[in-house]
Amino acid sequence: MLPPRPLLPRCLVLRTCTAAILGILPFWHAQAEEAPETIPTTLQAVTITGARDATTEGSGSYTTTGPVTTGSRLNLTPRETPQSLSIVTRERMEEQGLQTLAETMQQVTGIYVNYNDTERVTYNARGYAVNNFQVDGMLNLFGSSLKANGDNVVYDRIEVVRGATGLTTGAGDPSATINQVRKRPTRTFQANAALRIGTHELRRAELDVSGPLAFDGKLRGRFVVARQEAKSFRPLYEQDLGAVYGILEADLGPATVLAIGYERQKSDPRGSTWGTV
């Protein structure tokens, strides 16, 4: 058993602790003097504003989050619009091969498509004939039913509102309103060409060119052309379709855009069943 070691005197322990504390105090004081005073910095407020764009071309989506004008002029999104609304985007037209308005309407909920003959097409919704057609949100009462089955090559999307649209078409119509929204010029250059060959000697060519023209993109243009020829399983029946569309846009101000355009579509069938039994 080891002999017990003598305890240090209490006064010696206190002296050692006091000396250690006194030795550290100057170091703390020096650090406190060297630390710079922190002054809070107040940043200026940053306001970010933007406009929602309803264009569907290049979005890769079957819907749009931008405002629609078919049901009202309030620039409401499809979710905010208090009516039954369907939108067929450019992406869906291309992926499903929806070439004409009639083919598009066959994919829309609540729309009945009736082919009266090889050329004339009528639409019904909620038990009534659809007579309200819009182009870029402007009411257009087509004088011929042939225009009601135009080529989709010039359109960015097609909006369909089921029920009356009295806010945009006056008295409204209990059936539906079909709004065909055309393509707009882009701020960057783009060009697309397509060729299609199918059964019954189907031959189709498309060209779509868009981009800035002058004034650092404040003047833009777009040109779209398509031509199609085809025969059919019906004897002697042939199709000869064409579409031409051109538009110019100019920025007159931060919130003002002037647009002028021209569209022409033709249908020159041979051996159609129009007027025959």
For the regions a language model picked out, list residue spans one by one.
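N-terminal Sec signal peptide and the immediately downstream disordered periplasmic leader
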Residues: 1-96, 102-110
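Short, glycine-/polar-rich solvent-exposed loops and beta-turns at beta-strand/coil boundaries
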Residues: 39-41, 104-124, 151, 171-174, ...
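Outer-envelope exported proteins of Gram-negative bacteria
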Residues: 45, 49, 102-104, 122-124, ...
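Structural signature of outer-membrane beta-barrel domains
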Residues: 53-55, 198-200, 228-230, 265-269
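Non-catalytic regulatory/gating segments with a bias toward low-complexity or hydrophobic composition
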Residues: 85, 93, 105, 158-163, ...
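Short acidic/polar hinge/loop motifs at secondary-structure boundaries
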Residues: 113, 122, 138-162, 180-182
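Outer-membrane beta-barrel translocator/receptor signature
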Residues: 153-156, 167-246, 252-256
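Flexible loop and strand-edge segments within Gram-negative outer membrane beta-barrel domains
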Residues: 262-277
